[in-house]
From Swiss-Prot:
Belongs to the complex I subunit 3 family. It is an enzyme of class 7 (translocase). Its EC number is 7.1.1.2. It is a multi-pass membrane protein. Pfam families: Oxidored_q4. The gene is MT-ND3. It comes from Oryctolagus cuniculus. One of its GO terms (biological process) is mitochondrial electron transport, NADH to ubiquinone. It is found in: Mitochondrion inner membrane. The lineage of its organism: Eukaryota, Metazoa, Chordata, Craniata, Vertebrata. One of its GO terms (cellular component) is mitochondrial inner membrane. Core subunit of the mitochondrial membrane respiratory chain NADH dehydrogenase (Complex I) which catalyzes electron transfer from NADH through the respiratory chain, using ubiquinone as an electron acceptor. Essential for the catalytic activity of complex I. The keyword 4Fe-4S does not apply. This is NADH-ubiquinone oxidoreductase chain 3. Disulfide bonds: none annotated. Keywords: Electron transport, Membrane, Mitochondrion, Mitochondrion inner membrane, NAD, Respiratory chain, Translocase, Transmembrane, Transmembrane helix, Transport, Ubiquinone.
Length: 115
């Protein structure tokens, strides 16, 4: 009974807040508020300029190695298993695959900034 009551109250509050948000439009839209902010000065150029593709490649490479760290962090807890060889083989496979990917990026000159 208590669970149903909590779910009903949460759903009701959520629906009320969503309908209020849709019914009340933004009344004060100023051009100064919607323009990009550059340290208190007027913008020198358009804020919608495209980025270099190198930024995206470096960001994707960073995300891959960040995921590697996230996958390797549970290794101390995995060391509690009886079959430690399997854990070490999987960790070495993950590190070697990522090392091969890094070597491929390096050979393809994906990490060099000079164009």
């Amino acid at each position: 009974m208590n669970l149903m009551l909590v779910l009903l109250i949460n759903t009701t509050i959520s629906l009320v807040l969503v309908t209020i948000a849709f019914w009340l439009p933004q009344l004060n839209i100023y051009s100064e508020k919607s323009s990009p902010y550059e340290c208190g000065f007027d913008p020198m150029g358009s804020a919608r300029l495209p980025f270099s593709m190198k930024f995206f490649l470096v960001a994707i490479t960073f995300l891959l190695f960040d995921l590697e760290i996230a996958l390797l962090l549970p290794l101390p807890w995995a060391a509690q298993f009886n079959n430690l060889n399997l854990v070490l083989i999987m960790a070495l496979m993950l590190i070697s695959i990522l090392a091969l990917g890094l070597a491929y990026e390096w050979i393809q000159k994906g990490l060099e900034w000079v164009e």
